[in-house]
Structure formats: structure tokens, C-alpha cells
Amino acid sequence: MKRAADYIEMKSPAKPEYVGIIRLTLSGIASKMGYSYDDIEDLKIAVSEACTNAVQHAYKADKTGEVSVRFGVFEDRLEIIVADQGDSFDIHDKQKGLGPYSPEHTVDQLSEGGLGLYLMETLMDEVRVQIDSGVTVSMTKFLNRERVDDGTTVQNYETN
């Protein structure tokens, strides 16, 4: 099993003003890896959506929490995990209430809310959502759109 060349983790308070810091960190990592400008913008939008969902929905107004973001830097891809320990939701119920998305519809015809998941799935090569004690969104963007799947992911990477 290949290990990530670099593994970066950051935690921030679940507040909107810290999402920009996560975006800046991501931009630096992706630029260092050689992603194109367009791919970096896609990465930033997807990660911002995941972080914003955690900030807006994970913690009730009277409850404070944090957002954890992990970056797994591989030779051929960047894997990002955004996690919170807040209130969970049923993703399948959420998707049923929103879809189906159709290319014939313009953005203003889509129902409000839930566009974050749609954007993440559109902009990233892989997206997985795990709901347990909180919500964990795992996203992968392959460098140069090449994909060689050997099963190594940030989720099964063990830190020493």
C-alpha cells in the first residue's frame, strides 16, 4: 500500500471567517503539486462547500465545535477529508428532496439548499460522505485526470 508523500492536518473553529484560511492552505498545496489554475479553483470551491456545510449545519447556535481538514498528498492525486463532530443528517433523504438534477435546468431553477453536495460531486473525481458521530466528506482530485487505483486513501492511511 502506498503512503501519502505528505500528510497535512488542520483544525479550525467552526466559524465562517476560518474557511478562507483552509482555502489558502489548499491553494498552496495544490499549486505545489502542479494542478492547473482551473483545477485549483474547482478544489477550492468543493472544499469551501464542505467546510461551509460543517460551519452552518453541524453545530447548533448554542454549541461550539471545530472543523477538521486533512490533506493526503499523493503522487497522482490529492485527497481531502473535511470532518465535524456535530449533528448528522440523512444524506439519502437530502438527495431525494433535491434531485434529480437535469442539464436542461438552469442554476436558478434548482431547489435552494443542497447545491454544495452537487458541486462537490461535479468538481471532484470522487466524493464520499460518511455519517457517524458527525459528518465526514472525503474528496479526491486526480492530477492530470489520470487514475490508478491501488486502494490507498487518506482514510486508510495510518499516522505513526
UniProtKB/Swiss-Prot annotation:
Q: Which GO terms describe its molecular function?
A: ATP binding; protein serine kinase activity; protein serine/threonine kinase activity; sigma factor antagonist activity
InterPro entries, per database record = Anti-sigma-factor_SerPK (IPR050267), HATPase_C_sf (IPR036890), RsbW (IPR010193)
Cross-referenced Gene3D superfamilies, in alphabetical order?
Histidine kinase-like ATPase, C-terminal domain (3.30.565.10)
Q: What are the UniProt keywords, alphabetically?
A: ATP-binding, Kinase, Nucleotide-binding, Serine/threonine-protein kinase, Transferase
Return the broad EC class.
Answer: transferase
Q: Which catalysed reactions does the entry list for this protein? A: L-seryl-[protein] + ATP = O-phospho-L-seryl-[protein] + ADP + H(+); L-threonyl-[protein] + ATP = O-phospho-L-threonyl-[protein] + ADP + H(+)
Transcription regulation among the record's keywords?
A: no
Note one Pfam family from the annotation.
Answer: HATPase_c_2
EC number, as in UniProt:
2.7.11.1
Similarity section: Belongs to the anti-sigma-factor family.
PANTHER family listed in its UniProt record: ANTI-SIGMA-F FACTOR RSBW-RELATED (PTHR35526), SERINE-PROTEIN KINASE RSBW (PTHR35526:SF9)
Its biological purpose is as follows:
Negative regulator of sigma-B activity. Phosphorylates and inactivates its specific antagonist protein, RsbV. Upon phosphorylation of RsbV, RsbW is released and binds to sigma-B, thereby blocking its ability to form an RNA polymerase holoenzyme (E-sigma-B).
Annotated protein name in UniProt: Serine-protein kinase RsbW
Protein source organism? Bacillus licheniformis
